[in-house]
């Protein structure tokens, strides 16, 4: 098999490891490097005919993307003294500047209430761009049975009844509660929605740590890659750390991918999450997905107060995810929890990170209690909460997950649901 680095000049320095990034994409890691060696690697690429496509620096983290027969992405992180060189043969170029588009809609963020009748997770965020198209994040679990239809109807409603246009669909990672309903939409509702591009970076289904992940993750990754590959009209952008891309009037910066976890173990599949910082209408929204301990270390070490934002999606549904320090640095006025009230209440005393995020915020919102609509730029007091649409089927939940609750608790939860439903 041809070595992808045969046609890419590489600095004369021993590597600390070579990583299979998936789909023919590979990465070389060099430790004990300097910024001068980063510049040398860039010069080698340029002298070999690679064209500088994009450059973006964050504090003392330097990133350049070059294009030739393959895409070469090179970045150096001073805090780690580490240089990474990624060779990507399959990605599509992204927009490096804001798109020239109509100004016909209010830029708005929604935390969507996924159907939690049978499941306590899932995550779907939608951002309406100023031209009325959407950038959306993740989707819902297979047990949110009707959410493929609910998501399309929601986007249609906020498109003025027109066929929704998704300018970009981003996936943090390939757990079923984040991708399953997207797959159903593409396979069964393709004529009802236009999807221009998908943005993601997943590890291979046969990753070196895949034996920790279980058969379900293997099957979901295989299905996702097949469905996306067969959707030939959808552009596929493979994201790498430090890249800054634009979708309509929205700016995104890639903060972390599974490539940054290497050479450490990715036993916890949540560490495969790609984290994004979005800037919209001058305000920042941080989406860490389900980022966990290893990803958290990467972002704290590299970015510090660059993580400051106006709105933060709390990692991993408020279960064990990013650290309390992550939320101190984010210091967001609005915290979003893609979880049910039940699980939120269970985790609150256990998770210092949740308590820190809430203590710092002026407001926080739990997805199961109703879709939250946040006009951008974010201003405290302008968030609208929609009536609650779904409620737990406790018999079904017990049969699936063996979660059992007292009659008193179930009655209390139902009474609270009725208040939210009728508000």
Label every model-predicted segment.
Residues 91-164, 236-308, 374-423:
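Core dinuclear metal-dependent hydrolase active-site scaffold
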């Amino acid at each position: 098999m041809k070595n992808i680095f045969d046609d890419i000049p590489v600095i004369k320095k021993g590597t600390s490891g070579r990583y299979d990034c998936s789909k023919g994409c590979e990465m070389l890691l060099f430790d004990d490097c300097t910024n001068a060696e980063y510049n040398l690697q860039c010069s080698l690429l340029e002298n070999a005919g690679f064209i500088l496509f994009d450059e973006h620096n964050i504090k003392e983290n330097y990133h350049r993307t070059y294009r030739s027969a393959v895409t070469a992405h090179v970045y150096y992180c001073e805090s780690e003294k580490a240089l990474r060189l990624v060779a990507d043969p399959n990605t599509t170029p992204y927009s490096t500047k804001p798109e020239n588009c109509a100004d016909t809609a209010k830029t708005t963020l929604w935390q969507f209430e996924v159907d939690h009748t049978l499941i306590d997770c899932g995550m779907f965020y939608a951002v309406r761009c100023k031209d009325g198209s959407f950038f959306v994040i993740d989707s819902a679990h297979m047990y949110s049975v009707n959410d493929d239809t609910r998501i399309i109807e929601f986007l249609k409603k906020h498109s003025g009844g027109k066929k929704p246009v998704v300018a970009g669909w981003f996936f943090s990672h390939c757990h079923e509660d984040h991708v399953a309903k997207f797959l159903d939409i593409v396979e069964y509702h393709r004529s009802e929605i236009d999807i221009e591009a998908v943005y993601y970076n997943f590890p291979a289904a046969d990753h070196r740590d895949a034996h920790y992940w279980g058969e379900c993750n293997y099957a979901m990754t295989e299905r996702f890659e097949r469905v996306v590959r067969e959707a030939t009209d959808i552009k596929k952008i493979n994201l790498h750390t430090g890249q800054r891309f634009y979708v309509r009037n929205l700016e995104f910066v890639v903060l972390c991918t599974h490539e940054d976890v290497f050479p450490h173990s990715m036993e916890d599949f949540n560490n495969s999450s790609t984290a994004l910082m979005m800037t919209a209408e001058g305000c920042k929204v941080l989406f860490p997905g389900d980022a966990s301990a290893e990803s958290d270390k990467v972002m704290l070490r590299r970015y510090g107060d660059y993580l400051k934002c106006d709105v933060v999606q709390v990692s991993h549904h408020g279960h064990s995810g990013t650290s309390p320090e992550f939320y101190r640095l984010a210091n967001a006025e609005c915290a979003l929890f893609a979880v049910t009230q039940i699980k939120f209440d269970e985790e609150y005393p256990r998770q210092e990170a949740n308590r820190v995020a809430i203590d710092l915020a002026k407001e926080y919102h739990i997805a199961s209690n109703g879709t939250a609509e946040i006009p951008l730029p974010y201003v405290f007091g302008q968030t609208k909460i929609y009536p609650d649409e779904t409620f737990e089927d406790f018999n079904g939940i017990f049969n699936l997950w063996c979660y059992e609750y007292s009659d008193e608790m179930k009655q209390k939860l139902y009474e609270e649901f009725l208040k939210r439903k009728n508000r």
